[in-house]
Amino acid sequence: MSIFSRLKKVVAGDDYLDDDYGTELEYEDGLEPSDSTLDRGGAIAPIGSFDDGDPFASSNVIGMPGITSAAAEVLVMEPRSFDEMPKTIQALRERKTIILNLTMMEPDQAQRAVDFVAGGTYAIDGHQERVGESIFLFAPSCVTVTTASSEESAAPSVMAREEEATAPAAPSPAWGTQDAING
């Protein structure tokens, strides 16, 4: 062997190490494809094809019952009698937000209507908010209601200078003094 052939064997490796075993596939010649598995071009079509008319087969999106992807709908209702209140509850069940203007009703009927719709809203875990005089907002659980007045009450208030002078000073805690630590 020449020096070049030895170098070639070392760098390229031996042919018997590079032989791919098991790459030959065994086929059974006894089975012929049936007409149902052949497509128009004569090739074999997959048996469990996802194109069997299922429109959601290629999509990973799973629909949730009762929830639509359409825009949220807000209904403004001005009932004249209590008899119109079941329509309000049905709209809430259909996940629609309701603005209920009760200025057209008598005060006792309006109170009864608000109690009825508030009970229905509570039953579906919805939200209710008073918007104005005899005007109420009822929303299903899928709608978040935030008011500016609740944000203002959560914000710290600034006391006036006169209030600061009259406000009593908070007592210092006993556990924070030096005498309490030394005993």
Swiss-Prot record:
InterPro entries: Cell_div_SepF, Cell_div_SepF/SepF-rel, SepF-like_sf. GO terms for cellular component: cytoplasm. GO terms for biological process: division septum assembly; FtsZ-dependent cytokinesis. Residues 149-183 are annotated as: Disordered. Keywords: Cell cycle, Cell division, Cytoplasm, Septation. It is found in: Cytoplasm. Pfam families: SepF. Disulfide bonds: none annotated. Belongs to the SepF family. Homodimer. Interacts with FtsZ. Cell division protein that is part of the divisome complex and is recruited early to the Z-ring. Probably stimulates Z-ring formation, perhaps through the cross-linking of FtsZ protofilaments. Its function overlaps with FtsA. This is Cell division protein SepF. It comes from Synechococcus sp. (strain RCC307).
